[in-house]
Amino acid sequence: GEISRMFSGGTPNVGIPEYYNGNIPFIRSAEINSDQTELSITDKGLSNSSAKLVEKNTLLYALYGATSGEVGLSRISGAINQAILAIIPEKKYSSLFIKNWLYKQKSSIIEKYLQGGQGNLSGSIVKELTIHFPSLPEQEAIGELFQTVDQLLQLQDQKLATLKEQKQTFLRKMSPAQGQKVPEIRLQGFDG
């Protein structure tokens, strides 16, 4: 039987300025895991296009281009375009479990359906995928485990970025500036 409801969106006509710069975040495939979007659309842009609204925490799957096969839970409510498939599972299925399953299967899905990186994924391809589900409590426990791991990885990425920034600052301040003979910061015990 059906495990979910799925739909894609669309893009408002870019030639009509009043469809853009509104209050609805416009989520594109590279932004499925982001809490902000580069573009936003207006109510008029939404109603005059096939863009579709999704709630925060909706399972999103990238169908086209370089991001094909990327999966995430939306961090914001917004509208999606045609390059994204929203997947809304029935009550006995966990979004987190499906997200992690799709993440794990990404390379085999790409290899099978996008030979040589050509073409696009589609809702009908996703509907044909076979997922073996444990009980809902086990799905939720598995999903939560990987969500915790993802959060830890994100924290480590932030720590690494901060450390790289600090290194750049020290490199800049511990080397003499142009026209200077001594750096702004010196190690203790060194002078001259």
Regions found by a protein language model. Give the residues of each.
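A short beta-sheet element
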Residues: 22, 28-30, 37-103
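Non-catalytic DNA-recognition/assembly elements of restriction-modification systems
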Residues: 1-10, 35, 186-192
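Short, solvent-exposed loop/turn positions at domain surfaces
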Residues: 13, 47-48, 148
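Amphipathic alpha-helical segments with low aromatic content
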Residues: 128-130, 134-192
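Short beta-strand/turn micro-motifs at beta-sheet edges
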Residues: 70-74, 114-120, 173
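A short glycine-rich beta-alpha junction/loop motif
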Residues: 14, 78-85, 103, 115-138
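Extracytoplasmic/periplasmic mature domains of Sec-exported, cell-envelope-associated bacterial proteins
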Residues: 107-108
